[in-house]
Amino acid sequence: IDSLANVFEAGTDPLLLRIKVEQGNDYIYYKTKTPITVNSVHTEVLGEKPTSTAVVKAFYKGTNILGERFDGFEGADPVDGDSNASQPDTPPVSFDLSGSVIEGWKEAIPHMKVGERWLIYIPWKYCYGSTGNSNTTLIPGYSALIFDIQLLDADSIQKKSEPSKD
């Protein structure tokens, strides 16, 4: 993740963007990706940002910095009703941003708009910290993680008058 800061500061990757975390001087880096066309995007909130307490629905894949998948959809893209796909449909996952999700998701997802797809690089202290995740050997302590997330729905959205923190 430190090398991402160097890339961002040097401006060598114009697609690399960042979000300043709420507390501290750290950043979470991300790139926008082309979203897959899906039937499960909630069109009434398309283009809106969720609140920090929203229950959101998303496709996601989590990998460690070696690219080893530990959770979420398989392959390069989620599958949503494509009968020609070589893998089964990817069920979207719903989760509460004010609940027990990693801090990096709580920081990044409220900056996303429903319908967007981001590749998010999260520093270890906003993931599973120094202890790692005991449910998998793929996330030892001090692991930075990468998440491919396509936001499909949010049960509460930011008001238009709220200033953006981007």
Would you name each region that the model predicts?
Residues 1-166:
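Cross-family detector of peptidyl-prolyl cis-trans isomerase
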